[in-house]
């Protein structure tokens, strides 16, 4: 949810802007955090100690965030299912000779694929086009030591594959769990918020029902009743019903089910923008129902956690360290220029833009779908499996970071739904995140969506529009002209193509991880998996991709032997 950014295996222009408006002005340059030189290509990652960022403009780091205990997730059906799938990789027969699998893209999908292939005894060779890990969870450090990210990343209790991954890496303590609530701004009451509080003493779905019934500020009782009646088929029909709604937009489904339009105004607009960065007139209802289904089925499903620091170091580097400890490789600055084919149409190699040729026993594309389509060989474009990808297009999104000269009071140690026409969700990261903590200054991180009309606008325009919206959320503390709280600095990160746009009738176009091209596989949240275009979906897609490769390992090994024999004859 609310994850943005992308990894690039082609010459896309990645737009990252930073404007100077005070003596704390930041650099536009991307800053490396733990890179080691490589004789073979690009940069090879090496382990690096985690250092707190230098902060000259206020007192040393001192954490006072009040977090909540990690919820009991291990006994949920989905967590057990995810743990079992992990165990199959560790228990799989050790190969006589590990397969070399070349993977394009070091976002969560590529990292997940590589991690579980390494668990199965194979050798992943991970190639990332940029000089930073993470893809849609990438982040950069400015010259002041402050981090700015591609998105505001939230980890839900209903993310069993992500939660398993944290446990397997031994980093559960890096998630800062917040109060089990959802907090919405009240547009008609500037500066005020409305809460949905989930009681710990009740099981699901009663805790969610109680939270909705107890909130009398956003929906009236008649609206709640009609909303509940509209959701009954989803509760009773389960996953088959949810999948059958793929062809309807949120608004079309509401009309069909007799749900009042105010439910969209009060709830679904905020959910749609948080889940997929678009409004409910465009979003497939399946997307909303998948989220609601998970939240209602699992007691802690809607409970949220923040990562305790920047994602490249706090999440991605532990995965890289794990992969390397099992013999895998991770290379940065290794952009794919071309997928070279054999005479039979299978992959011969990946040609990098630095001239290097990468060969393997199998190949994975774990980039965004837009990058895959750009590099798709002409010989493959007539295959229905690849033709269906045309419907899948990344959605634009903008992530905004603003450092203020004071500590804002009208905020919470939590994710907040702005219910603004321009903004989606936001958080005061100086409160919610340990690494970004500041006792004297707030740093608001905000998702600017929908962004289609703004992606080409200047950073100054985006900041001015953001400040106008913030003046409504903080009427006593922020004004658009900065006559109240003043901006010390800001960063604007634009992503022209983020997660795929989940419009109606996309589901049949999502590809399974095993392609019809022998030895070629896909990973990414756009591929077929039961979760949303999200961090959870990316991790699960990588796991399913690794599973397909392990299942095909004997075939792939035989292909490799034939290739070697042919090469020796020549």
Curated annotation (Swiss-Prot):
Record's subcellular location: Plastid, Chloroplast; Plastid, Chromoplast; Membrane
Transit peptide start and end: 1-98
Membrane topology field: Peripheral membrane protein
GO CC term, one of those recorded: membrane
Catalytic activity annotation: 2 a plastoquinone + 15-cis-phytoene = 9,9',15-tri-cis-zeta-carotene + 2 a plastoquinol
Protein family per UniProt: Belongs to the carotenoid/retinoid oxidoreductase family.
Protein name: 15-cis-phytoene desaturase, chloroplastic/chromoplastic
């Amino acid at each position: 949810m609310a994850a943005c950014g992308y990894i690039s295996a082609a010459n896309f222009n990645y737009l990252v802007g930073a404007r100077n408006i005070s003596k704390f002005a930041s650099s536009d340059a991307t800053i490396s955090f733990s890179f080691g030189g490589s004789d073979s290509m690009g940069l090879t990652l090496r382990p690096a100690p985690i250092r707190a960022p230098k902060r000259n403009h206020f007192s040393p780091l001192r954490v006072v965030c009040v977090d909540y205990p990690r919820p009991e997730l291990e006994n949920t059906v989905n967590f057990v299912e995810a743990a079992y799938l992990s165990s199959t990789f560790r228990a799989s027969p050790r190969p006589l000779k590990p397969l070399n699998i070349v993977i394009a893209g070091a976002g969560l999908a590529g990292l997940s694929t590589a991690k579980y292939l390494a668990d199965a005894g194979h050798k992943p060779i991970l190639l990332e086009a940029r000089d930073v890990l993470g893809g849609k969870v990438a982040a950069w450090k400015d010259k002041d030591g402050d981090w700015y990210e591609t998105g505001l990343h939230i980890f839900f209790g209903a993310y069993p594959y992500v939660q398993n991954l944290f446990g397997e890496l031994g980093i559960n303590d890096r998630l800062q769990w917040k109060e089990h609530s959802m907090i919405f701004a009240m547009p008609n009451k500037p500066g005020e918020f409305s809460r949905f509080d989930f009681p710990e003493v009740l099981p699901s779905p009663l805790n969610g029902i109680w939270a909705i019934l107890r909130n009398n500020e956003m929906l009236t009782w008649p609206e709640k009743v009609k909303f509940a009646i509209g959701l009954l088929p989803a509760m009773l029909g389960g996953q088959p019903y949810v999948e059958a709604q793929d062809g309807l937009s949120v608004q079309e489904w509401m009309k069909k089910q007799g749900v009042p339009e105010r439910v969209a105004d009060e709830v679904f607009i905020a959910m749609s923008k948080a889940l997929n960065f678009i409004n409910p007139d465009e979003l497939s209802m399946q997307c909303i129902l998948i989220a609601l289904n998970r939240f209602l089925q699992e007691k802690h499903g809607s409970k949220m956690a923040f990562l305790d620091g920047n994602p490249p170091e706090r999440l991605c580097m532990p995965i890289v360290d794990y992969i390397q400890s099992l013999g895998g490789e991770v290379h940065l600055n290794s952009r794919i220029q071309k997928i070279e084919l054999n005479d039979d149409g299978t992959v011969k190699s990946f040609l990098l833009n630095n001239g290097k040729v990468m060969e393997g026993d199998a190949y994975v594309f774990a980039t965004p779908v837009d990058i895959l389509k750009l590099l798709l060989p002409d010989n493959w474009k007539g295959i229905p499996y690849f033709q269906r990808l045309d419907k899948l297009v990344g959605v634009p999104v903008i992530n905004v970071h603003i450092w203020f000269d004071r500590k804002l009071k009208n905020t919470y140690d939590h994710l907040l739904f702005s219910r603004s026409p321009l903004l989606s969700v936001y958080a005061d990261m100086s409160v919610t995140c340990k690494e970004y903590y500041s006792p004297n200054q707030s740093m608001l991180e905000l998702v600017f969506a929908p962004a289609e009309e703004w992606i080409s606008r200047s950073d100054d325009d985006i900041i001015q529009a953001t400040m106008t919206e913030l003046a409504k959320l903080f009427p006593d503390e922020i004004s658009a002209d900065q006559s109240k709280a003043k901006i010390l600095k800001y960063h604007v990160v634009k992503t022209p193509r983020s997660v795929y746009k989940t419009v109606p009738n996309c589901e049949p176009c999502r590809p399974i991880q095993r392609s019809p091209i022998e030895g070629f596989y896909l990973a990414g949240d756009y591929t077929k998996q039961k979760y949303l275009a999200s961090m959870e979906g990316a991790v699960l897609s990588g796991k399913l991709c690794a599973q397909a490769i392990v299942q095909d390992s004997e075939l792939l090994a035989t292909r490799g032997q034939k290739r070697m024999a042919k090469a020796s004859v020549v």
